[in-house]
Amino acid sequence: MRALRSTRLIALIGCGLAVVLVGCGKKDAAFEIITPPVPAVLPKHWNVPEFALTERTGGTVILADFSGKVWVADFFYTTCPGPCPMMSSRLSEVQKQLGTEPNLRLVSISIDPEKDTPDVLKLYAEKFQATDRWLFLTGPKAGIYALARDGFKLPIAEPETPGGQIIHSTRLILIDRLGAIRGFYEATNETGVNDLIRDIRKLLKEK
């Protein structure tokens, strides 16, 4: 009788253990992190519209100057106390890794052109050791705001209070050789700049 009870007890323990193991297996599967695959070909969004702005050197830059080039754009201003220095640091990292690529350009467009004159932009560019392949642009405020909102579809707004911060996007935008936007990357996220560098390399290989 005791032997029978012992056998039943062992069987029950075995079943319980089996249930626990199966349950754990299901739980692990439920919490498994699945990383979405990186697309082999980057999607094409829309084309950047025509523009004409002034570079820190005093020269005029137009959209056609980027024909045949892969370029990365951002909208910033030199007195920004918030994310702009980080955005510029991210582009500096791109320059560090890919700055020798002859068909790559970095383009920082000021959204405070009244203060960000070419001379001011020149001093700012020096802080980040920007080469001549990293352009800093300024120009008419209305045109720049329209370019940000309508051309790149990025939010931008005047300060809510006098002397306040200009509200703007912290995204970096990747544009291909034909002027088509191919991706947006969050500059405040380290993963964003890593993804950007990866995708720049993809576009540089595109014919």
At which residue positions do the language-model features occur?
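Conserved helix-turn-beta segment immediately C-terminal to the redox Cys motif
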Residues: K69-V70, M86-I109, E126-K127
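N-terminal "domain-start" segment that seeds a small globular fold
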Residues: A29-A64, S89
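C-terminal motif of bacterial Sec signal peptides marking the signal peptidase cleavage site
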Residues: V20-G23
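Thiol-based oxidoreductase modules, predominantly thioredoxin-like and allied folds used
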Residues: N103-D116, D132-A142
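Short, internal strand/loop/helix patches
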Residues: K122-S169
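Thiol-/selenol-based redox modules, centered on thioredoxin-like
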Residues: E160-K207
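Short active-site neighborhood of thiol/selenol oxidoreductases, capturing the structured segment around
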Residues: L63-P85, R90-L91
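Bacterial N-terminal signal peptides that target proteins for export
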Residues: M1-I13
